[in-house]
A protein has these predicted regions:
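N-terminal carbohydrate-binding accessory modules
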Residues: 31-86
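Aromatic-lined ligand-binding clefts that engage carbohydrates, nucleic acids, or primary amines
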Residues: 426-440, 469, 539-562, 569-570, ...
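Aromatic- and acidic-residue-enriched segments that line the glycan-binding/catalytic groove
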Residues: 101-107, 120, 131-155, 206, ...
Length: 785
């Protein structure tokens, strides 16, 4: 229509207004095949360009699956009010494809709606579709059913894996492709894979994933992300590179520039805090350092994404596990600027004030939306119970016990049952346990098999007659990072009694899904104190609101409120509460169901106005870490290497003059770069005879002379979890023991080692090791003090 040819000016205005409205409408939502493009986004020589103008991406990560759908708009409004102009979002493949070929894009999995709300709230979107995500999510978002192929190689060009990936990403393109900026939507970039440099070096695999996204209809700029030291592994030179780090942007961007001389600088994961794992201290970020590094990036025209801007909660059974085995809490608060419950923290307002100094032309910051109502309620008793052993399905008969995947089960628990003969006290041993095995004789618990310590055997008491042996296996989420991701769950055969293989098993599937919960037979009879059981109760509310369920009187398990699984709990902490969103509660009668595998002190529950995220109770743990006070007898004949590390934060690779063979590896710190009495290690990898990193599967910390657990999580296990943003740190809170410091790893089996990689602490410099000695030996020789 030529406006100039219309004689009636009012009509011309009406037609022009309608035409502009058509251009700015997201027609893809209404089913129109091609939506008009109203904006452009490109990657320039120095800057990101939005409609041809410099655009500094101020992004923050929020995962739709970790926020109730009813609260998506509120959290996105909070992100906008903090000063973000973009939100970054992972997709979790296993959430969207729970069974092969069955896709879910509704409810909590409606990521398209999340993106549409982001657009309505004035936010752009960076999409991270996978297929691998990490994110402390079950198996890094990879579907468990792939593990039904015993020999499948994940994150490789294995045809079975790639076929499944291509099917999934095609669905992602169908669902989210119309929401790209090139089609009138908010998605400005899409990520190829995720931190692949930590995992492999196959550029062919990365090319396959890139081409699959292109074939799925993604036509926005694609990019990949890695920490700078891993970036060149599998790096595609025709893809934009973004760096992940938690501190020191100047140094890390300098590393990025060596690999990518041109283009804007971007930190794709910048950490304001960290996630929590069961049994370790709650993490708090260094806010002053966070703000200082953030301002450096703002002042130097660098873009960034705060991971996490809002962490939320890993509801359901979706929480993952750090390597080699450190299960994550359901709370994903992350010490983020927006708290788990969506509150504006002091860090939120400090971040907002900082962003206000660097707004782009025409930008203003809206006021934060009001917080959701908070309620508390008095303790109520759960008066009904359903013992696990009295609510079993039909058994599967098998000669030897298999893992859960063998029986087509992905989540929940599994009970393995057999008969054993009368006899004297004797040893029960399994090949491995994934993850916790509660062992019962005739219904009475006699011990726990514990993957954390590689405890795969225990002493059974004397039996005057043949007895029923039950092993109730509880998985805690599959490993979500590193080569240990193919984390099959359950009892790993063979199972031996006094060295003889036990045969003839009944296997009971306990998936903890809606169907199973609906079939439970509750009674008013209380079970034995430590028998595994479901508990049920109701409580009345005058009005709904967010609350935190106090679980300090309970043991270990999972809980549901009005049919919604709130996640896992464990009395050892640090989390002692479960976030119950008000949108899942209602005025009047509410129902709660709690599975307790250990047995509660009292079957009562109360609602609190504030969470408890930082209360460790190690005395309640059924396993005490094996780090006894001792003096080491390190024989010089066991020494594989000695030398000095270079100062700074760069990864350093040490090659032994001669490969050494043993089951134990010891790194001894003789002094520190800064002369202080501390030692710290961000990450240790051991190298095989071919110079490749040895899998951490089965590794445990055999001994550490000192670790800080009061003021921060400086646990020794941090040195082998694959994460360079956290670290082992010797004690500094209530004491500061001096050098030498020793960390000994039990590798689970004898290995031939040709060297090791050492990653120094990446943030402040305290504890960076200067002079060291490395030992490899077959027997741990400790002399008790």
């Amino acid at each position: 229509v030529k406006i100039s040819t219309i004689s009636n000016p009012r009509l011309a205005v009406v037609i022009l207004t309608a035409f502009v409205a058509f251009l700015t409408t997201d027609h893809s939502r209404a089913g129109v095949g091609v939506a008009a493009t109203t904006h452009t986004f490109t990657i320039g020589t120095n800057d990101f360009l939005l409609d041809g103008n410099r655009f500094q991406i101020r992004c923050g990560e929020i995962h739709a699956a970790r926020v109730p759908k009813e609260y998506w708009r509120h959290r996105l409004q909070m992100a906008k009010a903090m000063g973000l102009n973009t939100v970054c979002a992972y997709l979790f493949w296993n959430l969207h494809e729970p069974k092969p070929g069955e896709f879910v894009w509704t409810g909590q999995a409606d990521d398209a709606e999340f993106c549409r709300i982001a657009k309505e709230e004035g936010l752009w979107v960076i999409l991270r579709p996978g297929p691998y995500a990490c994110a402390e999510w079950e198996m890094g978002g990879t579907p468990w059913w792939l593990l039904k192929h015993d020999d499948i190689q994940l994150r490789t060009r294995d045809p079975r894996y790639l076929k499944a990936v291509k099917s999934y990403l095609k669905e992602v393109g169908r669902e989210l492709g119309p929401l790209q900026i090139t089609h009138g939507g908010p998605i400005i970039m899409a990520q190829v894979e995720n931190e692949y440099g930590f995992f492999g070096k196959d550029t062919g695999y990365m090319t396959d994933i890139k081409n699959t996204l292109l074939d799925a209809g993604f036509d926005v700029p694609l990019f990949e992300c890695n920490p700078p030291d891993q970036m060149q592994n599998g790096m595609l030179t025709n893809l934009f590179q973004a760096a992940n780090f938690g501190s020191d942007p100047e140094h890390n961007f300098a590393k990025l520039r060596k690999l990518q001389p041109a283009g804007p600088l971007m930190c794709s994961e910048f950490y304001p805090g960290w996630f929590d794992t069961w049994g370790q201290p709650h993490h708090l970020g260094n806010t002053a350092k966070y703000l200082s590094d953030l301002e450096y990036m703002l002042a130097h025209d660098a873009s960034f994404s705060i991971y996490m801007a809002h962490g939320g909660t890993t509801f359901g059974l979706w929480s993952g596990c750090d390597r080699p085995f450190k299960p994550d809490t359901s709370s994903y608060d992350y010490d983020a600027p927006i708290s788990e419950a969506g509150w504006a923290t002091p860090k939120f307002f400090q971040t907002r004030a900082l962003f206000a100094k660097y707004l782009l032309p025409g930008e203003t910051l809206p006021a934060p939306p009001p917080p959701n109502p908070i309620i508390a309620f008095a303790p109520v008793e759960l008066t009904e119970s359903a013992p696990v052993f009295e609510n079993l399905p039909t058994a599967i008969k098998d000669s030897l016990p298999g893992n859960m995947e063998t029986y087509d089960q992905g989540y929940g628990c599994m009970l393995y049952r057999t008969k054993i003969p009368a006899g004297a006290a004797t040893t029960l041993q399994v090949a491995a346990i994934h993850d916790f095995g509660y062992v019962y004789l005739n219904g009475k618990r006699v011990g726990v098999l514990d993957r954390r310590s590689a405890t795969a055997k225990l002493l059974l008491p004397e039996r005057a007659a043949p007895a029923r042996l039950d092993i109730l296996v509880e998985p805690m989420g599959r490993v979500n990072f590193g080569p240990e991701m193919a984390d099959r769950k359950g009892l790993i055969a063979p199972v031996k009694l006094n060295g003889e293989v036990l045969k003839g098993w009944d296997i009971f599937k306990l998936p903890l899904d809606d169907k199973m919960l609906a079939g439970l037979k509750f009674t008013g009879v209380k079970p034995d104190t430590n028998a595994p059981a479901f508990w049920r109760g109701t409580f009345q509310l005058e009005h709904a609101g967010d609350t935190f369920l106090d679980l300090r009187g309970w043991g270990k398990g999972d809980l549901w409120i009005n049919g919604h699984c709130l996640g896992r709990y464990w009395n050892i902490g640090p989390s002692q509460t479960a976030f119950a969103p008000g949108c899942w509660l209602h005025r009047g009668l509410n129902q709660i169901v709690i599975l307790d595998l250990l047995g509660p002190q009292q079957p009562k529950i109360a609602g609190m106005e504030k969470p408890i995220l930082d209360q460790l109770r190690p005395a309640l743990d059924f396993h005490v870490q094996n780090h006894p006070p001792a003096k080491l007898n390190l024989d010089s004949s066991m020494m594989a290497d000695s030398g000095s590390f270079a100062p700074g934060t760069d990864t350093q690779e040490i090659k032994f003059a001669t490969p050494a063979t043993g089951k134990y590896f010891c790194l001894e710190s003789l002094n520190a770069q800064d002369g202080q009495p501390y030692a710290a290690v961000a990450e240790l990898d051991l190298l095989d005879v071919n110079g490749q990193a040895i899998s951490h599967d089965g590794w445990t910390v055999a001994y550490v002379d000192s670790e800080e657990l009061e003021k921060e999580d400086g646990s020794a296990a941090n040195a082998i979890d694959g994460q360079t943003a956290n670290y082992w740190h010797t004690q500094w809170g209530s004491a500061s023991p001096g050098h030498p410091h020793q960390l000994i790893l039990n590798l689970g089996k004898t290995q031939t080692i040709s060297g090791f990689r050492y990653v120094p602490r990446q943030s402040e410099g305290a504890g960076r090791i200067k002079d060291y000695r490395a030992f490899v030996f077959t027997k741990l020789d400790l002399l008790t003090k």
